[in-house]
Amino acid sequence: MKRIQTEAAAGRKTGGSVDLLWVNGENFRTLKEANLLQTGWAETLPNWRYVDTQLPVREDFSVPTEGAESPWGGAQLTFIARRDVTPQPPQTPQTLLEFAKANPGTVTYPRPPDFTGTAFLEQLLIMLTPDPTALKEAPDDATFARVTAPLWQYLDALHPYLWREGKDFPPSPARMDALLKANTLRLSLTFNPAHAQQKIASGDLPASSYSFGFREGMIGNVHFVTIPANANASAAAKVVANFLLSPDAQLRKADPAVWGDPSVLDPQKLPDGQRETLQSRMPQDLPPVLAEPHAGWVNALEQEWLHRYGTH
């Protein structure tokens, strides 16, 4: 990203050194607002016909993609529990709070600004705020204070019952997995719905581990590739983006033995055989996908969380 910005600042409008990149939502917004990306090409790819357009493939962190990004994988915030320990998991923020009170010290979340920790804050915010439509736009100070008030009230109630009484937080989801395996925690968190399946296969989680989410839905997103406006080989970049959408590539990528990255294809649009294979590699019984807040909320949430809870 820095290279693209540097070349633009130097006036290099053609012959750029970057042809295709995997970009996150915050960086996409930055590049798009600066007019540094090609637009209108993604849905012209031949393999777009297989894409599941019920997924958020036309927006990235609530920013319309306008054909400037091609999807190639999905993700969704997902809880993990052990069926032998937690056969009935919490299904709402309120029942999660009740679960934590009933099982003190066994619930936690990764310390923001860890990506998954911040996603957990976003998840709670979406479900607790009385004004979810405000999350579609970047916040100003007044909006932020009003919309997030229920979140901080909830966390103030939750934290005393967390692992280490909410005075310390795991640095990563991997640390949570280890604590779940050791039976210290009752829940772990991931942003890959296939994560539990992968970790069971590798022996990093017990065979009784399973994925679940809140009944109303869990936030999810799509990861994309994009082409800089000054790309030197944009035609070749589109060939690669199209390959990433091919059924063969998506099936291999979805294989837990290879990566286990969720597909962005609609199984019903695939030929027999490929359809069944893809369905077998997709986690079952996932909750609905909730759109993420606008990218402008991320840093604001992280900074306020650190101000309130990060000095323990």
Where are these regions (language model features)?
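Hydrophobic residues within well-ordered alpha-helices
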Residues: I4, L31, M176-K181, I227
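A ligand-binding cleft/hinge motif common to bilobed small-molecule-binding domains
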Residues: F28-T30, L187-P206
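Early extracytoplasmic/lumenal segment of secretory-pathway proteins
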Residues: M1-T30
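Short, hydrophobic alpha-helical packing/hinge segments within bilobed ligand-binding/sensory domains
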Residues: M1, F28, M176-D177, A237
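Mature extracytoplasmic/periplasmic domains
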Residues: M218-I219, H223-V289
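Conserved C-terminal helix/tail region of periplasmic/extracytoplasmic solute-binding proteins
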Residues: A178, P283-H312
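Periplasmic-binding protein-like
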Residues: F61, A75, Y154-L158, L205-T226
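Extracytoplasmic ligand-binding site segments that recognize negatively charged/polar headgroups
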Residues: V18, N24-A174
